[in-house]
Amino acid sequence: MLLIEEKYRSVAQVLLSSGTCSRCVLRFCCVGSPANYRLPCKEVTYELQKYLSHGDPAEENDTPPSKKAKIEEDTSSNEHLGNCEDVNGSQVVRICPLCLGILQQFCEPEFIEKVFVKINSAVYELKDFVLSISLPAQLSVREHSAWLQAKQEMGKHGHSLDKTDIVQLKEAYKWIIHPLLSDQLGIQADSKSLFEVAVVFTHPETDGDCHFLATVCRDCFKPTKNKQSVFTRMAVVKALEKIKEEDFRVQFPFPPSSPETTCEVVDIQCNHSPVFVAGRYNKYSRNLPQTPWIIDGERKIESSVEELITDHLVAAFRSSSFNFSSSGREDVDVRTLGKGRPFAIELLNPHKVQFTGQEIKALQQKINTSDKIKVRDLQIVSREAVAHMKEGEEEKTKCYCALIWIEKMVRNEDLQLLDGLEELTIAQKTPLRVLHRRPLASRSRTIHTMRTEYVDEHHFRLYLKTQAGTYIKEFVHGDFGRTKPNVGSIMETNADILELDVESVDVDWPPSLDD
């Protein structure tokens, strides 16, 4: 039994006479009960017929009609009410001009099975799902036309009809689809689910419905590089908000043209929200870049820190791809020691997402079979937690150990001079070695502390604590005067760096784990 208020009677009559399907009639009559939309199309049609013929069905106490009674209904009424009738029968089904068949053809078991097969074949680990629908932009134009007509009908009887009162097509469709798909998958629909099933509809036959808006509201339709069409749903909705009602009626009168074809499903996409894995890595090789070193398509070094970590994670989470980020980076010939450098990996579209602490620890052990890197504190974290790694980037400190050569003999007083320097401010221009990939800039950096250790007459070790972002190699040799002051200028000699180790990255993230 449909619960339609009496004030919507004329709206229902006008829409039905225009060939609108019974479920779209419910939408424009502001029926907000999902159960009504889930009824078979034939039953909705019958109830609407009874409503228009005999009065408000809420006042009727009849039992549901038999199949024979339905068949014997007045055939003249069925010409208007039969949009959803007997899809497999001899009767020609009229395609709804408002939903373009979405609430007719695409709520049937055959389509549900098609979606189920798509999800099942992707082999995701699921606990719930959310359905998203992408609709052709021209549906907004057709709905606007129907709303103006419905509002006019309501106005004749002293009633108003706001556009927001109408049940949105997406909402009605989900009311019907969710329980059917839930039954097939054996899991519940949840609007907050991390697993999304996206159904993309198009309707080439009516693509031209939107075109008149471009002449009326030109500022709404500006071409962009990444969009194939300027007639996006957002642009169309914006134009519909601007256009005057009388201008719209002239350009797009009611009822909209009856389509000869239903919408097409061009894609059914499955996607799981990213999972973030964080940890710290040590790098022990002086011939290993942080990320793949590929120039003009040619790999320069066999592997990288990124690959040695992510290869295992991508395989375990069965993700489609990933994004690697870290708290700074070291050069290919620089080691990272101590507790390591914090990193985070965004695993995109993972198919497996449930891991125990022991399974993550086993993954860490697998990564650590490499003799080039080691990982610690490996853990799954939230997207929000990853932001902590980048917070206060300029205020972070890092500690280094550098093996330095100088041209003149190492004197004790020279080492003491360096030992006594604290909070030394230096000016650094973008180093020549990275100028090809970074813009020219001049920046101020602070060397907080320095401590020296004599090695031999031309070598010593320099232990530094610096502001993050300091170029240590350039601070030693001066980069042809682009870093001032530098170790060479302070000691009044030529200086160069032979080895560099990162001893600590002072970021209290991710949380330490008991390994």
Curated annotation (Swiss-Prot):
A GO molecular function held by the record: tRNA pseudouridine synthase activity
Places the protein is found: Nucleus; Cytoplasm; Mitochondrion
Record field: catalytic activity: uridine(55) in tRNA = pseudouridine(55) in tRNA; uridine(54) in tRNA = pseudouridine(54) in tRNA
Family note: Belongs to the pseudouridine synthase Pus10 family.
GO biological process: primary miRNA processing; tRNA pseudouridine synthesis
Top-level taxonomy: Eukaryota, Metazoa, Chordata, Craniata, Vertebrata
Cited InterPro entries: PsdUridine_synth_cat_dom_sf, Pus10-like, Pus10-like_C, Pus10_N_euk
Region called Disordered, residue ranges: 55-82
Region feature (RNA binding forefinger loop): 291-304
Keyword annotations of the record: Coiled coil, Cytoplasm, Isomerase, Metal-binding, Mitochondrion, Nucleus, tRNA processing, Zinc
Gene3D superfamilies: 1.10.10.2050, 3.30.70.2510, 3.30.70.3190
Spans annotated as RNA binding thumb loop: 428-443
Pfam families reported for this sequence: Pus10_C, Pus10_N_euk
Coiled coil start-end: 42-85
Protein known as: tRNA pseudouridine synthase Pus10
EC number(s) reported in the record: 5.4.99.25
Enzyme class, broadest EC rank: isomerase
Active-site feature positions: D331
Positions that bind Zn(2+): C21, C24, C96, C99
The UniProt record lists the keyword Membrane: no
Record GO cellular component, one term: mitochondrion
NCBIfam families: pseudo_Pus10arc
Free-text function comment from the UniProt entry: Protein with different functions depending on its subcellular location: involved in miRNA processing in the nucleus and acts as a tRNA pseudouridylate synthase in the cytoplasm. In the cytoplasm, acts as a pseudouridylate synthase by catalyzing synthesis of pseudouridine(54) and pseudouridine(55) from uracil-54 and uracil-55, respectively, in the psi GC loop of a subset of tRNAs. tRNA pseudouridylate synthase activity is enhanced by the presence of 1-methyladenosine at position 53-61 of tRNAs. Does not show tRNA pseudouridylate synthase activity in the nucleus.
PANTHER family, alphabetized: TRNA PSEUDOURIDINE SYNTHASE PUS10
